[in-house]
C-alpha cells in the first residue's frame, strides 16, 4: 500500500553474514528463518511479521532494526500495510472460491513445495493473518495477548538457547516485538 519496489534496496545475504551486518547497522531489515531469526532478535532486531502470518507454515520472520523503525516509521507502516493487504486479498480469494482460490492454493503450494490438497490443508489450518488478527486478544498470533506472539517469542528463545544459537533467553521478550503503535499506524495507511 503506497510502497513501490524502488522504495526498497533488496540484497541477498547469507544468515551468518546478516547477523553481524545487523549488529553494525549495515542493513535495515532481513527476511530469514529461525534459528537465525532468534539470533537477529537477540541482537536487537524487532520482530515485524512471521511468515505464518501470511499463511506460510514456517517460522520465517520479517525484522527491522529499532533504528530503522525509529527513523522510518512511515516506511515501516507502509510495508506492514502491504503485507496486510496481501493477507486480506488472499483471504477474500479463498472465501470467493473457484479460480480466485486456486491462484492462492497454487502460490502456497509452490512456496511450500506441496500439492494443491496439502496447500488447502495448510491454509485451512493457518489462514492468512490480517492486522485485525494481530491486534486481537483472541488470536494465537496476537501482538497484544500474552498467549499470542509473545509466547511464541519466549518459546523461540528457549529453542535458540537449546540449539546454542544464543547464550541466554531474551530478558524482555516483549521488546522484541514491533510496538502495537506500528501495527495501528499500518491500519491507517491508505
Listing of model-derived features with the role each one plays in the protein:
Residues 1-13, 24-27, 46, 166-170:
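A local structural motif
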Residues 70-165:
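Secondary-structure end/capping motifs
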Residues 22, 129-132, 179-186:
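Short, solvent-exposed polar/charged micro-motifs at secondary-structure junctions
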Residues 150-190:
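Conserved C-terminal helix/tail region of periplasmic/extracytoplasmic solute-binding proteins
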Residues 17-113:
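Pocket-lining segment of extracytoplasmic ligand-binding domains
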Residues 14-17, 44, 133-137:
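A short alpha-helix capping/helix-coil boundary motif
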Amino acid at each position: 500500500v503506497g510502497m513501490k519496489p524502488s522504495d526498497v534496496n533488496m540484497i541477498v545475504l547469507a544468515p551468518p553474514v546478516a547477523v553481524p551486518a545487523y549488529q553494525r547497522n549495515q542493513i535495515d531489515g532481513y527476511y530469514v528463518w529461525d534459528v537465525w531469526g532468534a539470533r537477529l532478535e537477540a541482537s536487537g532486531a524487532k520482530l515485524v511479521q512471521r511468515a505464518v502470518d501470511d499463511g506460510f507454515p514456517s517460522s520465517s520472520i520479517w525484522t527491522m532494526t529499532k533504528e530503522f523503525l525509529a527513523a522510518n516509521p512511515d516506511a515501516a507502516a507502509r510495508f506492514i500495510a502491504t503485507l496486510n493487504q496481501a493477507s486480506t486479498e488472499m483471504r477474500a480469494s479463498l472465501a470467493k472460491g473457484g479460480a480466485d482460490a486456486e491462484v492462492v492454493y497454487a502460490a502456497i503450494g509452490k512456496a511450500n513445495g506441496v500439492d494443491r490438497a496439502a496447500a488447502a490443508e495448510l491454509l485451512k489450518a493457518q489462514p492468512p493473518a490480517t492486522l485485525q488478527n494481530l491486534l486481537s486478544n483472541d488470536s494465537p498470533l496476537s501482538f497484544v495477548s500474552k498467549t499470542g506472539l509473545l509466547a511464541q517469542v519466549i518459546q523461540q528463545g528457549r529453542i535458540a538457547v537449546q540449539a546454542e544459537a544464543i547464550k541466554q533467553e531474551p530478558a524482555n521478550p516483549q521488546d522484541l516485538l514491533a510496538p502495537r503503535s506500528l501495527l495501528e499506524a499500518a491500519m491507517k495507511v491508505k
